[in-house]
């Protein structure tokens, strides 16, 4: 088992019901991941499967898709290691995640972002924005009207974002480390994030 690359299998939002296992004993390449552990509780945990572990639910799919768009996609722009695409043939593919007791583990990133504080801040900020978009896509109270009654916002920001970017294209850009495709998609994501939160910005542009 020590010769195997990776440990427990991952779940995939791009291939629901499948588990991703890595590794042949004779595979000589090894790589380090930079996984994001998000303490968001059991909101994203569906019913336990045959292995008594939680399965994905609709909220899981939405949240991990948002992480692919806002965290995984810009990682293609920032991490230009030529081995990234090779690594993702077997490990760290788009939509890879686990559901630990504390919430969600996003397993797509390499450890490139751990090299300095600026990159760490960017990744954490993008993950936070993904969570904010997920939460804002549900009906929620936002302020009060003139009669002090709650004003409910019922606009699906997630659905609006997916009208602008195709998830299959996002997965392709991540899995192939396709810089040109990633830039085309990121331009559309940037338009959305600027509208969603004009004070935060998108964090990555051609001069970054």
Regions found by a protein language model. Name each.
Residues 1-208:
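Phosphate/nucleotide-binding catalytic core
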């Amino acid at each position: 088992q020590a010769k195997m690359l990776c440990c427990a299998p991952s779940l995939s939002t791009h291939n629901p019901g499948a588990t991703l296992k890595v590794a042949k004993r004779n595979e000589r390449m090894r790589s380090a991941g930079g996984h994001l552990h998000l303490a968001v509780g059991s909101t994203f945990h569906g019913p336990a499967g045959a292995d008594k572990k939680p399965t994905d639910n609709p909220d899981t799919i939405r949240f991990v898709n948002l992480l692919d768009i806002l965290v995984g996609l810009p990682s293609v722009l920032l991490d230009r290691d030529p081995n990234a695409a090779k690594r993702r043939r077997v490990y760290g593919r788009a939509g890879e995640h686990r559901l630990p007791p504390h919430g969600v583990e996003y397993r797509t990133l390499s450890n490139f972002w751990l090299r300095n504080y600026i990159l760490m801040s960017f990744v954490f900020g993008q993950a936070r924005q993904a969570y904010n978009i997920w939460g804002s896509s549900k009906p929620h109270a936002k302020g009060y009207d003139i009669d002090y009654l709650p004003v409910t916002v019922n606009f699906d920001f997630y659905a609006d974002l997916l009208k602008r970017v195709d998830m299959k294209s996002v997965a392709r850009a991540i899995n192939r480390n396709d810089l040109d495709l990633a830039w085309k998609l990121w331009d559309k994501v940037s338009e959305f994030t600027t509208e969603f939160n004009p004070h935060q910005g998108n964090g990555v542009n051609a001069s970054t």
